[in-house]
């Protein structure tokens, strides 16, 4: 017998397995423990003084549970199949490659960085302020920027594709069960390396190719049709199509496209800072209690407001996380956030960013479609020039001092491993960002009383939340509007944002590639 239950319980009732089973047993009227269950959905309702958990459960009495998967996957042998070049191994590239295999095409994945184990060593040196590798860092390398992040899988992009399918692929490759039922699923930076390594194994086992240290430096074009790519080591890779999934930080790709007179466009994006609070403070604000206890997860938040005609909002909020260095160039400071699966650090951080439109950048119009990219680069260099001279040290300021416009005499404890130095960020941040941030922080404190705290620190700069460039594609075929066979994909194309939407875009592009090749 199978039955479904919708339960609203206290966190301790859900978190204690014996208590939870007892409640299920009572609900189904089963006199024995001869049942198993699977959680279908779990969310937290923290609107009242006593947070509750809403749990949807499927119960199996006297029979084995059915599979948790709603989708079927058929990875076939594509060793001798038609090759398709996939540039980049982030979520968009990986999911494009896996879908191509299902559709009968051989992906040739070219990754400019290193495999994930070597990448971890380079990142460790970067965290210790000892070395910086332009091709192996928090943005570049196996799995892309998402590998060393919180691994958040929540997305509002429900029309882009099959979200459940993406979650199941991650789960099949080693992600935890909870991503299939949590309202806001995440994998965690400690588990993501295993997942992306398993995805690589699937690709290679099926006959696909996966090549590291393969930085694309040129495109092979004939009569406005792409035939392949050249890499920095002099190798050439040909394919029936090229999927360009290079991520939002591959500035050299944008420059290459512009150099070859391939159309790119300026688009709106966002930049700002990363704000860090003690996790206990965010817990008190969000859960309305002094201590969240052992059964509630580290509290998160999502806030947004319109300030002077532009959005100011939280981005990539990492409860129980750390701030990390995310620059891809020397002489520049970029920060981002990440969390382990347990989200068990003492800090809560989030990007707080300001919407920027191309028309806001009147001083950069000489850079054409790359005006936002140039603005982004200059702000990252300004942050480096105000970081006290360290390799990856970041400028910082107490949140209250930032809002009132004074230099901080001291800084709160901060999770950023390379270290922070007090800097008058209110002074050197561009007015279109700094002014809106100050007003935004004051408004956020009205929604989350206590957010504007002297215990909070602002760290700069959060500049890679989205791409300032779009590589335009045909609305029907998803090919580039000018170059046949070139399929821009993922965050770097300007058509996705975040792991899940990038993964869905990767699958979409693989299907569009197959449609094109099946017609010829």
Which residues fall in each region the model found?
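Residues forming the flavin
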Residues: 2-51, 57-148, 152-520
């Amino acid at each position: 017998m199978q039955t479904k239950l919708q339960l609203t319980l206290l966190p301790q009732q859900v978190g204690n397995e014996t208590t939870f089973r007892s409640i299920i047993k009572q609900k189904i009227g089963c006199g024995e423990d001869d049942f198993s269950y699977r959680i279908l959905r779990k969310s937290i309702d923290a609107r009242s003084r006593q947070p509750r958990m809403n749990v949807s459960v499927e119960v199996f009495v006297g029979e084995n549970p059915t599979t948790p998967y709603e989708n079927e996957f058929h990875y076939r042998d594509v060793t001798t199949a038609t090759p398709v070049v996939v540039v980049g191994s982030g979520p968009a590239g990986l999911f494009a490659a896996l879908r191509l295999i299902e559709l009968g095409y051989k992906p040739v994945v070219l990754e400019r960085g290193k495999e994930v184990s070597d990448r971890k060593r380079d990142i460790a040196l970067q965290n210790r302020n000892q070395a910086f590798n332009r091709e192996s860092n928090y943005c570049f390398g196996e799995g892309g920027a998402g590998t060393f992040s919180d691994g958040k899988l929540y997305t509002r992009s429900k029309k882009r594709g099959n979200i459940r399918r993406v979650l199941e692929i991650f789960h099949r490759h080693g992600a935890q069960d909870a991503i299939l039922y949590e309202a806001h699923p995440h994998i965690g930076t400690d588990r993501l390396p295993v997942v992306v390594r398993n995805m690589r194994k699937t690709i290679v086992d099926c006959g696909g190719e996966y090549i590291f240290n393969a930085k694309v430096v040129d495109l092979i074009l004939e009569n406005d049709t792409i035939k392949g790519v050249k890499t920095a080591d002099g190798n050439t890779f040909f394919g029936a199509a090229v999927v360009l999934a290079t991520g939002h930080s591959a500035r050299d790709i944008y420059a290459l496209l512009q150099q070859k007179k391939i159309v790119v466009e300026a688009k709106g994006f966002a930049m700002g800072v990363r704000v860090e609070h003690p996790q206990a403070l965010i817990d008190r604000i969000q859960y309305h209690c002094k201590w969240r206890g052992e059964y509630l997860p580290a509290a998160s938040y999502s806030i947004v407001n319109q300030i002077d005609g532009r959005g100011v909002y939280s981005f990539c909020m990492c409860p129980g996380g750390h701030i990390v260095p995310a620059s891809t160039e020397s002489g520049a400071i970029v920060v981002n956030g990440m969390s382990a699966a347990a989200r068990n650090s003492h800090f809560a951080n989030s990007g707080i960013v300001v919407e920027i439109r191309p028309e806001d950048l009147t001083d950069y119009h000489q850079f054409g479609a790359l005006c936002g990219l140039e603005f982004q680069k200059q702000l990252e260099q300004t942050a480096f020039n105000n970081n006290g001279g360290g390799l990856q040290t970041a400028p910082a300021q107490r949140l209250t001092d930032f809002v009132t416009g004074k230099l901080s005499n001291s800084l709160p404890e901060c999770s950023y491993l390379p270290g922070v130095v007090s800097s008058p960020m209110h002074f050197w941040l561009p007015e279109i960002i700094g002014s809106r941030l100050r007003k935004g922080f004051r408004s956020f404190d009205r929604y989350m009383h206590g957010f504007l705290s002297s215990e909070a620190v602002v760290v700069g700069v959060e500049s890679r939340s989205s791409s300032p460039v779009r590589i335009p594609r045909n609305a029907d075929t998803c090919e580039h509007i000018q170059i046949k066979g070139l399929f821009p994909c993922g965050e770097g194309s300007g058509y996705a944002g975040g792991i899940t939407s990038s993964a869905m875009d990767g699958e979409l592009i693989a299907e569009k590639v197959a449609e094109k090749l099946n017609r010829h």
